[in-house]
Amino acid sequence: MDDAELARRSILGFGEMVATLGGDGAVRRPDAVGAVVGFAADNHWLDAAVVPADAPPPAADDAGLPHCLWTVADAVPGRREEPRIAMPCLGLALDRRAPVASVEVDQPSLSELGEINDRAYGQVEQLAPLVRALRDDRLVTHGLRADGAFACVALTLRIGDDISIQYVATEQRFRRQGLASRLLTAVMARALATGATSATLQASPDGLPVYERLGFRRVATLKAFLRAA
């Protein structure tokens, strides 16, 4: 599987995850996939949409679009780039992975997953309210426990034969113990066993080294363009 296809899948996964979170605010059109989320209008990853890999950006700003538009393009009419938050898109062909030993992975509730993410990223009721309301058969939660409680979590969205890995988070006191690597290795092994051929995600600065050690490679960079004030 080449980089262009992995990039297409990663970008689609990000947009479809945001649209799924957005509920009634979902935006799905040929040049933008995401959601308008009013209470998170200052969050560039929740009140957001992505331009599909094979589409040009919208020709002009549109009040029906969220405040942040992500794209691989170098410019978007009517918007200004925020270069500090450019986001690497990563992908991995699962058929290249060797068998791995299993670890015990449980399924946290959506509420638990959202709350752990908010704590991990220093937010209060940003992601959690949206995640609690999710109702989609393509979504699966995953988690590892430590001291009897969930310490590391992730959410996957199945799109065709790709799993889009989203909202990986580890509680502060359990970081730097390899939990995220162990969890994602198990998640990908399970996905491969159910017919998935790729895993894709978007990386934060903290997560990027973890994902690269797991074999993910950078296949694109999404740039953030904000509505001009």
Give short role names for the model-derived ranges:
Residues 63-71, 191-203:
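Conserved GNAT acetyl-CoA-binding A-motif
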Residues 43-53, 161-172:
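Conserved acetyl-CoA binding element of GNAT-fold acetyltransferases
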Residues 74-82, 181, 193, 205-222, ...:
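Conserved active-site alpha-helix within GNAT-family acetyltransferase domains
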Residues 40-104, 225-227:
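Acyl-donor-binding surface of acyltransferase catalytic domains
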Residues 55-60, 170, 176-193, 213:
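Conserved acetyl-CoA-binding loop-helix of GNAT-fold acetyltransferases
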Residues 125-171:
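A conserved beta-strand-loop-helix scaffold within acyl/acetyltransferase catalytic domains
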Residues 1-64, 75-76:
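N-terminal charged segments
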Residues 1-9, 101-113:
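A short beta-loop-alpha structural element at the N-terminal edge
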